[in-house]
């Protein structure tokens, strides 16, 4: 076991897959000589050269389209968005090409493509560079969507994403790159479509992902001290949602709290509520509650920025309210 930062875990995953498979390549702005805006691709250029670690102009629609073409013709490109918000400029390519070509070609084309990069709130990067785009991409048919949350799952998930024959959008949070954790030195893979049970409990199911996993775990000691026993699931897969793992948990706890950094309107939480009500309504002792970011552009001011996203004290209050109110009703 060795203790590594998340950005190092992501780089190790990329390096290992490039070493094993000559078709794996990296494409994006400053991914080569500079080593990536968050150093996820540092030193890969010197090892693999210009043809496999390709610096591009600031033209997201162009190099994303190029990567899609490369995937169709047999390569396994990894597109790094310097910031995931920039990929809105390539939304047409991601939606109409990457997401649909396997279907519209009658299965004649596969698209082994990973689109990865940083996003999220917390570094005072302003409204345009602090967007939460998970739900934007969730609506596109044909995409798989993953959000890593620890160095361990970041490495295992990225290796699985690179090997997958379908396009995978891989979300990384800007505030988690310097998170450290011991990870195995031996190779391991993590399935792209499975949630992780972070903590087992019996009172309430907390569904979360990415940075909010850590806000939830920060709230746990106070909840446990006050006699509450929550079960915590890190969704990891945002498309498809792992409704089987969610079902197992909800059938045990009968209460659900969703904690997300996504916007409240039409966010990941909204889709979760829809699926839980569709599949598990009779199992619920209380309405599903979601804690989401406010539907406003992210402020540049640090205090205002922090106020737009869910904090641990809000999670504590929500758990207590849901559990206490539903116990009163059921008794």
Swiss-Prot record:
Residues involved in K(+) binding: 113, 161-162, 164, 166
A cellular component annotation (GO) from this entry: chloroplast
GO molecular function (one): metal ion binding
Top class in the EC scheme: oxidoreductase
Subcellular location: Plastid, Chloroplast
Database matches in Pfam families: Transket_pyr, Transketolase_C
Protein name as annotated: Pyruvate dehydrogenase E1 component subunit beta
Organism: Porphyra purpurea (Red seaweed)
């Amino acid at each position: 076991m060795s203790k590594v930062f998340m950005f190092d875990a992501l780089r190790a995953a990329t390096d290992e897959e490039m070493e094993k498979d000559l078709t794996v390549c990296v494409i994006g702005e400053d991914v080569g000589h500079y080593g990536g805006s968050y150093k996820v691709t540092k030193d890969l250029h010197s090892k693999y050269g210009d043809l496999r670690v390709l610096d591009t102009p600031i033209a997201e629609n162009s190099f994303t389209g190029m990567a899609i073409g490369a995937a169709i013709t047999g390569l396994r490109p990894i597109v790094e968005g310097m910031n995931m918000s920039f990929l809105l400029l390539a939304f047409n390519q991601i939606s109409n090409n990457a997401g649909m070509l396997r279907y519209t070609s009658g299965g004649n084309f596969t698209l082994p493509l990973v689109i990865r990069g940083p996003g999220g709130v917390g570094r005072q990067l302003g409204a345009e560079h602090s967007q939460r785009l998970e739900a934007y991409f969730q609506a596109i048919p044909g995409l798989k969507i993953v959000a890593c949350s620890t160095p361990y799952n970041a490495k295992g998930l990225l290796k699985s994403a690179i090997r997958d024959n379908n396009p995978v959008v891989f979300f990384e949070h800007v505030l988690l790159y310097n998170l450290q954790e011991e990870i195995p030195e031996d190779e391991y893979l993590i399935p792209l479509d499975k949630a992780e049970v972070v903590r087992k409990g019996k009172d309430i199911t907390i569904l979360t992902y990415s940075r909010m996993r850590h806000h939830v775990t920060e709230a746990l000691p106070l909840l446990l001290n006050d006699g509450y026993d929550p079960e915590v699931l890190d969704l990891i897969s945002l498309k498809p949602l792992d409704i089987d793992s969610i079902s197992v948990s909800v059938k045990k706890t009968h209460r659900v709290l969703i904690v997300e950094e996504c916007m409240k309107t039409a966010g990941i939480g909204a889709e979760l509520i829809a699926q839980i009500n569709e599949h598990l309504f009779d199992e619920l002792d209380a309405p599903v509650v979601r804690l989401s970011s406010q539907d406003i552009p992210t402020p540049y001011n640090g205090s205002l920025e922090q106020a737009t996203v869910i904090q641990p004290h809000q999670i504590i209050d929500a758990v207590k309210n849901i559990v206490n109110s539903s116990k009163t009703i059921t008794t």
